[in-house]
UniProtKB/Swiss-Prot annotation:
Protein encoded by which gene: DEFB1
Propeptide segment residues: 22-32
Protein family according to the UniProt entry: Belongs to the beta-defensin family.
Keyword rRNA-binding in annotation: no
Protein's name according to its UniProt entry: Beta-defensin 1
Organism annotation: Trachypithecus obscurus (Dusky leaf-monkey)
Length: 68
């Protein structure tokens, strides 16, 4: 009986994830913009980019700039 409740709970969690457009199944293989910025040698800043750097992209879903 306990395992059936556990399976039902797991199924409900999966269905709730699928209801929202951004779930773990669509996110497989995709890296966050923050990860890509830092990996390419940049840094994420909410303010303007420092002197002698330029904007290479965005971070935190477009809320910050990736400066490199």
């Amino acid at each position: 009986m306990r395992t059936s409740y556990l399976l039902l709970f797991t199924l409900c969690l999966l269905m709730s994830e699928m209801a929202s457009g951004d779930n773990f199944l669509t996110g497989l293989g995709h890296r966050s913009d923050h990860y890509n910025c830092v990996r390419s040698g940049g840094q994420c800043l909410y303010s303007a980019c420092p002197i002698y750097t330029k904007i290479q992209g965005t971070c935190y879903h477009g809320k910050a700039k990736c400066c490199k």
